[in-house]
From Swiss-Prot:
Its EC number is 6.1.1.15. GO terms for cellular component: aminoacyl-tRNA synthetase multienzyme complex; cytoplasm. Pfam families: HGTP_anticodon, ProRS-C_1, tRNA-synt_2b. Keywords: Aminoacyl-tRNA synthetase, ATP-binding, Cytoplasm, Ligase, Nucleotide-binding, Protein biosynthesis. Belongs to the class-II aminoacyl-tRNA synthetase family. ProS type 3 subfamily. It catalyses: tRNA(Pro) + L-proline + ATP = L-prolyl-tRNA(Pro) + AMP + diphosphate. This is Proline--tRNA ligase. PANTHER family: BIFUNCTIONAL GLUTAMATE_PROLINE--TRNA LIGASE, PROLYL-TRNA SYNTHETASE. HAMAP family: Pro_tRNA_synth_type3. Consists of three domains: the N-terminal catalytic domain, the anticodon-binding domain and the C-terminal extension. The gene is proS. GO terms for molecular function: ATP binding; proline-tRNA ligase activity. GO terms for biological process: prolyl-tRNA aminoacylation. It comes from Solibacter usitatus (strain Ellin6076).
C-alpha cells in the first residue's frame, strides 16, 4: 500500500493505532464482510511466531492439538443456561444449507465448550481416561457492532484449550498453570508486562465457576484483557452428561477447564511498543530480526557491496534488501514502518574500512561496528532491545498505577480517559464483587479488570461503594 503519514499518538491514539496497522502492512479492513479484517503476510508472520511459542509450551505440558467442527447445533448452547445467555447477542446462525431450511439451525462457533462437551461424553468413561488435555487452533465468529482491527473483529483467530479432570484440585492447577504460561509468553516473548488475577462475577466467562485473566496496560493507559483461563467446575460436565467411574467405583461428573488467547495479542503488542514512526516489534517476536540495506551509487560498486551484504547476511541470518528501483532512504523507511529491530547499512566506504552501520528500531541510534563482530553486536543489540522494551512498558505501567480509597477518587481519575485522547490509569481500590458496585463503575465506563493473585499493596480495606471490608485491592480501569 502507499506510504502515508502516521497520526501522532498525542493527537489521536485510536487513529495512530489504525495508521500503524495499515502502514506496517499488518492488516486491512475487509470492507465486503462487515466487521472482518484481512491479516496480511506481515501480521500473519507475527501470529505464526506466537503460535509456535504457545504450541511448544502446550506440548511440553502434555496437551494435544485437535480440531472440532465449526458448526454447532443450536440446541447444544441451550444446554448450559448461563453460557447461551452470555453469547446470545454475538451468535451467527446458519438456517439454510443446500438450498433447504435446516431442521435445526447451526451456530457458527463462538467458542467450543458445548461441542467438545458432547464428544467428551462419548470418550470419557473411566478415571483412566483422565486427564484429557486438548488444544484447538481455530477461527471463531462473534458478531461485533463496533470493531477495531486485531482488538475486536467479527471473525478472529485463536487457540482454545479444553481439559477434563477427575477432581477439582487438579482442574484448578491446570487453570493456574495455563495462566502462568500466558503471562510467560506475554512478558518474555512479547515484552508486555501483565497482571495475573481473578475476574469478578460480572466479568467471568459465561458458564464458568471462576475466570482468571492477564491484563496489560496500553500506552494510552487503557487495559487490554490479553488472555483468560477458566475453571468450569462441573457445569458443562452435567449439561452434557460427561461422567466417569472413579477409582472407588462411583459415577462422577468430570471437572473441566477452558482457556484461550487470540490475534488480539497482536493489537496489544502494537499499542504497547509502537511509536509515531510506526510498528515496533520485540526481537523475540519479530519474523525478520535484521535487514541489510546495500548502498551504492556507481554500477562498479554494486557487485562488491552486494556480495559482502549477502555474505554477512548468511553469517547472521539477516535479510538483504536488494530490490532494484528503490532508494536506500525508501528502504530504511519501509523497514522502520514494519518494525524490524535492526537495520544494517553497508556501502563502499564501509567495505573499505571493514565496518557496517547498525541502527536500532527502538532507540534510532546508529553505530559503526567491525564486520568481524557483526554477529555478536547484532545479537547483543537484539537482547538489549528485548529487555529495554519490557522495562519501558513495565515502568509505564508502574507510573500509571495509582491507589484510591473512595469511588469519587476513582471517578475523578478515570472519567476523562478515552481510547483517542488517552489519560487512562490502573486504579487499585477495594471494591466488592457485586452488581451494585459494577453498576457504579459503569456510570463512568470503567470495570474491574481483575483482582491480582499477588497483593502488592496494603491488604484488607473498605469497599469504595458499600463500605464493607474487602480482602485486597482490585484493578479498576477503562478497557478495550
Amino acid at each position: 500500500m502507499a506510504e502515508s503519514p502516521i497520526t501522532a499518538r498525542s493527537q489521536d491514539f485510536a487513529a495512530w493505532y489504525q495508521d500503524v496497522v495499515l502502514q506496517g502492512d499488518m492488516a486491512e479492513p475487509a470492507e465486503i464482510v462487515k466487521g472482518c479484517m484481512v491479516i496480511k503476510a506481515n501480521g500473519y508472520a507475527v501470529w505464526e511466531v506466537l503460535q509456535r511459542e504457545l504450541d511448544d509450551r502446550f506440548k511440553a505440558t502434555n496437551h494435544q492439538n485437535v480440531y472440532f467442527p465449526l458448526l454447532i447445533p443450536q440446541s447444544f448452547l441451550k444446554k448450559e443456561a448461563e453460557h447461551v445467555e452470555g453469547f446470545a447477542p454475538e451468535l451467527a446462525v446458519v438456517t439454510v444449507a443446500g438450498g433447504k431450511e435446516l431442521e435445526e439451525p447451526y451456530v457458527i462457533r463462538p467458542t467450543s465448550e458445548t461441542i467438545i462437551g458432547h464428544f467428551f461424553s462419548k470418550w470419557i468413561h473411566s478415571y483412566r481416561d483422565l486427564p484429557l488435555l486438548y488444544n484447538q487452533w481455530a477461527n471463531v465468529i462473534r458478531w461485533e457492532l463496533r470493531t477495531r482491527m486485531f482488538l475486536r473483529t467479527t471473525e478472529f483467530l485463536w487457540q482454545e484449550g479444553h481439559t477434563a479432570h477427575s477432581n477439582h484440585e487438579e482442574a484448578v492447577e491446570e487453570v493456574l498453570r495455563i495462566l502462568d504460561l500466558y503471562a510467560q509468553v506475554a512478558e518474555d516473548i512479547m515484552a508486555m508486562p501483565v497482571i495475573k488475577g481473578v475476574k469478578t462475577h460480572a466479568e467471568k466467562f459465561a458458564g464458568a465457576l471462576k475466570s482468571y485473566s492477564i491484563e496489560a496496560m496500553m500506552q494510552n493507559g487503557l487495559a487490554l484483557q490479553a488472555g483468560t483461563s477458566h475453571d468450569l467446575g462441573q457445569n458443562f460436565g452435567k449439561a452434557f452428561d460427561v461422567q466417569f467411574q472413579s477409582k472407588e467405583g462411583q459415577l462422577e461428573y468430570v471437572w473441566q477447564t477452558s482457556w484461550g488467547v487470540s490475534t488480539r495479542l497482536i493489537g496489544g503488542l502494537i499499542m504497547t511498543h509502537s511509536d509515531d514512526k510506526g510498528l515496533v516489534l520485540p526481537p523475540k517476536l519479530a519474523p525478520v530480526k535484521s535487514v541489510i540495506v546495500p548502498i551504492y551509487r556507481k554500477e562498479e560498486e554494486r557487485a562488491a557491496v552486494l556480495e559482502a551484504a549477502h555474505r554477512i547476511a548468511k553469517e547472521i541470518g539477516a535479510k538483504v534488501d536488494d530490490r532494484e528501483g528503490q532508494s536506500p532512504g525508501a528502504k530504511f523507511f519501509h523497514w522502520e514502518r514494519r518494525g524490524v529491530p535492526v537495520v544494517l547499512e553497508l556501502g563502499p566506504r564501509d567495505l573499505a574500512s571493514g565496518k557496517i552501520v547498525l541502527k536500532r528500531r527502538d532507540t534510532g541510534t546508529k553505530e559503526p561496528i567491525d564486520q568481524s563482530e557483526v554477529g555478536a553486536k547484532v545479537a547483543a543489540a537484539l537482547e538489549d532491545m528485548q529487555k529495554g522494551l519490557y522495562t519501558r512498558a513495565k515502568d509505564r505501567m508502574k507510573a500509571n498505577t495509582v491507589l484510591a480509597n473512595s469511588i469519587e477518587e476513582v471517578e475523578a481519575i478515570l472519567k476523562d480517559a478515552t481510547a483517542e485522547k488517552g489519560g487512562g490509569k490502573f486504579v487499585m481500590a477495594h471494591i466488592k464483587d457485586e452488581p451494585a458496585c459494577d453498576a457504579r463503575l459503569k456510570e463512568f465506563k470503567a470495570t474491574v479488570r481483575n483482582i491480582p493473585l499477588v497483593d502488592e499493596y496494603d491488604g484488607p480495606g473498605k469497599c469504595i461503594v458499600s463500605g464493607e471490608t474487602i480482602e485486597k485491592r482490585a484493578v479498576i480501569a477503562k478497557a478495550y
